[in-house]
């Protein structure tokens, strides 16, 4: 069920407004990239970016004075905003909050994040993630959503008043809609927003997000790209002494490797040279954090490339999600499914899997596994499509729950004593055999 379907409007209305037609079955894996806000020519986006940076400077000023746990929680800790239905959640829209650990990471590195060393055009909050090991696209996106929540509320309110029937709109007091610098606290504000009713019967507001600030992959400023772009970063260094030192340090590391290979009568491997260059650059960044700023300057100088790549990522992900899910939904409706509510969760799970297999293999549902002639290679895509065959069920279908033994793909249940685990693996996955070990762990 998509936003447009739920509220009885054509999907083109949402598209023309510039928003994403979100799904109420599961999150769409798209994330806000702050660099797209910074690069935009829209005045409202420019002001939005200024407000984001203003809050980061506020955090830096407070961090300099030292903070109590209460202050750390109030200013540095953020909850996930599930109302935009974007992110990783495979079941509904509830993901993980940024939490205390991320708050302390932010607190510890806020000075690094706000110091440009007079190199870049502006501050960028995603600079903080250059110190973060692993993917940070969901974290920086969630952080940004929290800091622009008021804008997203106004953006959605305007759409709702213009295009939706009043019966779908309700007044909500949205918590932490904006930050009041006089009281130094987040403030609630009332908005008229579309809503859905949760499984627990609670009315929850819905937020639309502009497509032009979203992408599927990592934000333009990210750690992996920083390390991969070491040659481009070196070319950006306008400090002659620093550039000479960086080049000499990397050259010495390569020479040491080549001498070692020569002593051991081994040939020089080009891939090894590249790795040594990258590792040397990584070590240099610890000593000279200005290198991070030269990298950001490099990204700032390529706004067209950033926008083009983000647009391609977003468009492909949406087209894949829309077209493939609609293909599968149509097949499911045409074929029908006999719902049996008096059987065990295990049998119901097996029946739904058989039905899913039948749709894919015998009803041309396999077309939903391809996009532009290319096979979908991600298990996540297959899992999202599997969600659509569970229509009309009274069983609880949780995607990626964690019972303390790691995440299972799905747990189907009706009470504590009537549960079944479902694991997905592509046949091409080298760890296919491991799935049976995983299930035993989950069942323990």
How should these model regions be labeled?
Residues 406-408:
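Short beta-strand or tight-loop elements
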Residues 425-444:
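Catalytic cores of nucleic-acid endonucleases
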Residues 167-168, 386, 444:
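Nucleic-acid nuclease catalytic cores
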Residues 181-392:
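The feature marks a conserved, polyanion-engaging helical scaffold used by nucleic-acid processing enzymes
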Residues 1-173, 182:
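Long, contiguous, compositionally biased segments that the model treats as domain-scale units
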Residues 411-421:
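Active-site beta-strand-loop-beta-strand hairpin of nuclease catalytic cores
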Residues 398-403:
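Short beta-strand
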Residues 35, 411, 425:
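Anionic group-transfer/hydrolysis microenvironments
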């Amino acid at each position: 069920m998509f936003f447009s379907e739920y509220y009885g409007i054509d999907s083109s209305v949402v598209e023309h407004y510039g928003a994403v037609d979100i799904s109420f079955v599961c999150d769409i894996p798209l994330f806000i990239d702050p660099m797209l806000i910074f690069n935009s020519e829209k005045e409202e986006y420019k002001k939005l970016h200024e407000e984001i940076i203003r809050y980061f400077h506020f955090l830096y000023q407070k961090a300099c004075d030292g903070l109590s746990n209460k202050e750390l929680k109030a200013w540095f800790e953020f909850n996930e905003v599930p109302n935009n239905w974007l992110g990783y959640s495979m079941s509904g829209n509830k993901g993980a909050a940024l939490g205390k650990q991320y708050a302390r990471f932010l607190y510890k590195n806020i000075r690094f994040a706000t110091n440009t060393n007079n190199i870049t055009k502006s501050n960028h909050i995603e600079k903080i993630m250059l110190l973060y090991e692993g993917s940070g696209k969901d974290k920086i996106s969630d952080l940004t959503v929290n800091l622009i929540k008021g804008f997203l509320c106004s953006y959605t309110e305007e759409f709702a008043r213009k295009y939706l029937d009043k019966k779908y709109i309700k007044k909500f007091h949205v918590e932490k809609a904006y930050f009041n610098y006089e009281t130094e606290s987040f403030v609630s504000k009332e908005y008229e927003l579309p809503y859905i009713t949760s499984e627990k019967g609670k009315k929850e507001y819905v937020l639309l997000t502009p497509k032009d600030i979203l992408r599927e992959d990592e934000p333009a400023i990210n750690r992996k790209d920083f390390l991969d772009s070491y040659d481009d970063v070196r070319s950006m260094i306008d400090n002659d002494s620093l550039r000479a030192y960086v080049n000499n340090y990397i050259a010495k590391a390569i020479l040491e490797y080549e001498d070692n290979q020569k002593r051991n009568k081994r040939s020089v491997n080009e891939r090894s040279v590249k790795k040594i260059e990258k590792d040397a650059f990584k070590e240099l960044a610890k000593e000279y954090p200005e290198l991070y700023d030269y990298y950001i300057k490099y990204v700032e100088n390529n706004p067209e490339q950033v926008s083009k790549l983000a647009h391609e990522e977003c468009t492909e992900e949406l087209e894949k999600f829309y077209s493939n899910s609609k293909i599968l939904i149509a097949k499911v409706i045409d074929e029908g499914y006999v719902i049996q509510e008096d059987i065990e969760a295990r049998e119901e799970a097996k029946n739904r899997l058989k039905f899913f297999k039948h749709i894919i293999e015998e009803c041309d549902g396999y077309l939903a596994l391809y996009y532009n002639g290319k096979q979908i290679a991600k298990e996540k895509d297959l899992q999202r499509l599997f969600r659509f065959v569970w229509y009309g069920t009274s069983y609880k279908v949780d995607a990626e729950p964690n019972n303390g033994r790691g995440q299972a793909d799905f747990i189907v249940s009706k009470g504590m004593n009537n549960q079944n685990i479902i694991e997905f693996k592509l046949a091409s996955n080298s760890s296919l055999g491991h799935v049976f070990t995983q299930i035993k762990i989950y069942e323990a």
